[in-house]
């Protein structure tokens, strides 16, 4: 080979070797990359793969209430809440209301009332003594919060009841014509069912809380004469839907405005107003939530709970029948049993809705005409107005406590200086401790109030 050929041959061989080395480097790089990604794929869990984005829903373990605990043993009642709504109304911006009540969900208590579609300092408050108008609505606030302009209007109603089944609120709301009213059943904020008047004479309900056990709620409703025979029915509702209706049975002659409480599953017990024949506060109304059976009678205590009533020395009750003592008109009230005894509340005046007292009657639930009274407390002194009252139940860790509210009515018909009628509220709950004395009236100076 000449020198030029040697140079060309060496150059060609070098280029070939370089090309082979380059290709080998590419092959090694490709192998490393492949092995790297395979190793990562094996170490990545399956849930890291790409999936559609969906909201994560965490369900709470919400249960229906069963009220299976025993009733708390109490020595009397201690102050719990007072809303002072009429005193605050002097500055304006507070609803005109009446017929208040209190009911609690598993964690918090609320106060309810029927609003008149106006505030006290407005001309529309003139004439609010009337019970049934299309402007009345059910108001709902946390207990202790007066019904200000931001208050929620739950439904249209001039008669109603509310209760919480452990999952949601049920509201039974009656409104419409006296001769053809409608009751709407609102559950969890939605209208679920309804029922029309069955006697065409002011369909009405409890004006205090209903009771729910294991998802079924019961409410007492009456349609018919307020001073004669009427048709009372007990409705059973599940998540807003009527599932059964039972007629009244037993010896009760007239039932209105029941104050009900859970009592020894599957029973609900109510004490109601006889607006016709008796001042002995019917009704030991016993409702069986399991088989829908009903029984009724009268509170045995000879110290009777309605207003008007006879003097205590001449009042009576035989447990089974109305006492025919000043039975008409009457007022909403409450009582509850504790063994054979009965705790009860009533106006201090036997003739009018003034003052308020509570006491325990020994054997007042079991023995006719019992009159042995103990643990008396004055809630409102007799120089101040009271009104409706009712019961509500609160479940603690170990027992079921009984509480009550008193409506403190001001304005007409007793105070004619003003044109309106409204109320505030005071609330007490059972206590096993000691307690003092006092009086908790509405407290508004009528001369400071708008006319």
From Swiss-Prot:
Which positions in this protein are listed as binding Ca(2+)?
Answer: 274, 278, 306
Where, in residue ranges, is this chain on the Virion surface side? 30-451
TM region positions: 7-29
Recorded GO terms, molecular function?
exo-alpha-sialidase activity; metal ion binding
Question: Which cofactor does the UniProt annotation name?
Answer: Ca(2+)
User: In the Enzyme Commission scheme, what number(s) does this protein have?
Assistant: 3.2.1.18
Provide the catalytic activity annotation.
Hydrolysis of alpha-(2->3)-, alpha-(2->6)-, alpha-(2->8)- glycosidic linkages of terminal sialic acid residues in oligosaccharides, glycoproteins, glycolipids, colominic acid and synthetic substrates
- Xref: InterPro entries: Glyco_hydro_34, Sialidase_Influenza_A/B, Sialidase_sf
| Chief place where the protein resides | virion
Glycosylation is annotated at: 32, 48, 66, 123, 126, 180, 214, 384
Which CDD domains has this protein been placed in?
Influenza_NA (cd15483)
A biological process (GO) of this protein is: viral budding from plasma membrane
PTM info: N-glycosylated.
Q: In terms of domain of life, where is this protein from?
A: Viruses
What activates or inhibits this protein?
Inhibited by the neuraminidase inhibitors zanamivir (Relenza) and oseltamivir (Tamiflu). These drugs interfere with the release of progeny virus from infected cells and are effective against all influenza strains. Resistance to neuraminidase inhibitors is quite rare.
* Subcellular localization, as worded in the UniProt entry: Virion membrane; Host apical cell membrane
- Keywords carried by this UniProt record: Calcium, Disulfide bond, Glycoprotein, Glycosidase, Host cell membrane, Host membrane, Hydrolase, Membrane, Metal-binding, Signal-anchor, Transmembrane, Transmembrane helix, Virion
Binding residue positions for substrate:
98, 132, 256-257, 273, 353
Q: Which GO terms describe its cellular component?
A: host cell plasma membrane; membrane; virion membrane
Domain annotation text?
Intact N-terminus is essential for virion morphogenesis. Possesses two apical sorting signals, one in the ectodomain, which is likely to be a glycan, and the other in the transmembrane domain. The transmembrane domain also plays a role in lipid raft association.
Name of the protein described by the UniProt record: Neuraminidase
- In its UniProt entry, the species of origin is given as Influenza A virus (strain A/Chicken/Pennsylvania/8125/1983 H5N2)
Lineage of the source organism? Viruses, Riboviria, Orthornavirae, Negarnaviricota, Polyploviricotina
Name of encoding gene: NA
């Amino acid at each position: 080979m000449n020198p030029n050929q040697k140079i060309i041959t060496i150059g060609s061989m070098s280029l070939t070797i370089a090309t082979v080395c380059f290709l080998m480097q590419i092959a090694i790089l490709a192998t490393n990359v492949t092995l790297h990604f395979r190793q990562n794929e094996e170490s990545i869990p399956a849930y890291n793969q790409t999936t559609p984005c969906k909201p994560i829903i965490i369900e709470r373990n919400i249960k229906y209430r069963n009220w299976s605990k025993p009733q708390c043993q109490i020595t009397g009642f201690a102050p719990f809440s007072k809303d002072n709504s009429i005193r605050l109304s002097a500055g304006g911006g507070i609803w005109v209301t009446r017929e208040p009540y209190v009911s609690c969900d598993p964690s918090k208590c609320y106060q309810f009332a029927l609003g008149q579609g106006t505030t006290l300092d407005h001309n529309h408050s003139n004439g609010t003594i009337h019970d049934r108008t299309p402007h009345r609505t059910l108001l709902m606030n946390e207990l202790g919060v007066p019904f200000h302009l931001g208050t929620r209007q739950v439904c249209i109603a001039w008669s109603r009841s509310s209760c919480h089944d452990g999952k949601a609120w049920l509201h039974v709301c009656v409104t419409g014509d006296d001769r053809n009213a409608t009751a709407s059943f609102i559950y969890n904020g939605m209208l679920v069912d309804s029922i029309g008047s069955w006697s065409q004479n002011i369909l009405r309900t409890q004006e205090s809380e209903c009771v729910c056990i294991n998802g079924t709620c019961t409410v007492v409703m009456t349609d018919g004469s307020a001073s004669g025979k009427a048709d009372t029915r007990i409705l059973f509702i599940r998540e807003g839907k009527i599932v059964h209706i039972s007629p009244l049975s037993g010896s009760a002659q007239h039932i209105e405005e029941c104050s009900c409480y859970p009592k020894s599953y599957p029973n609900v017990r109510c004490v109601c107003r006889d607006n016709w024949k008796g001042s002995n506060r019917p009704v030991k109304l016993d409702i069986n939530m399991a088989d829908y059976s009903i029984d009724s009678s009268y509170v045995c205590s000879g110290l009777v709970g309605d207003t008007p009533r006879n003097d205590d020395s001449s009042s009576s009750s035989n447990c089974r029948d109305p006492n025919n003592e000043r039975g008409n008109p009457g007022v909403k009230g409450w009582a509850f049993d504790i063994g054979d005894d009965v705790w009860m509340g009533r106006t201090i005046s036997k003739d009018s809705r003034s003052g308020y007292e509570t006491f325990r009657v020994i054997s007042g639930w079991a023995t006719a005409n019992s009159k042995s009274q103990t643990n008396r407390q004055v809630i409102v002194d007799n120089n101040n107005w009271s009104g409706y009252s009712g019961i509500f139940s609160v479940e603690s860790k170990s027992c079921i406590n009984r509480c009550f509210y008193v409506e403190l009515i001001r304005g007409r018909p007793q105070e004619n200086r003003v044109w309106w009628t409204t109320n505030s509220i005071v609330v007490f709950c059972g206590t096993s401790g000691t307690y003092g004395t006092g009086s908790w009236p509405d407290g508004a100076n009528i001369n400071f109030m708008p006319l």
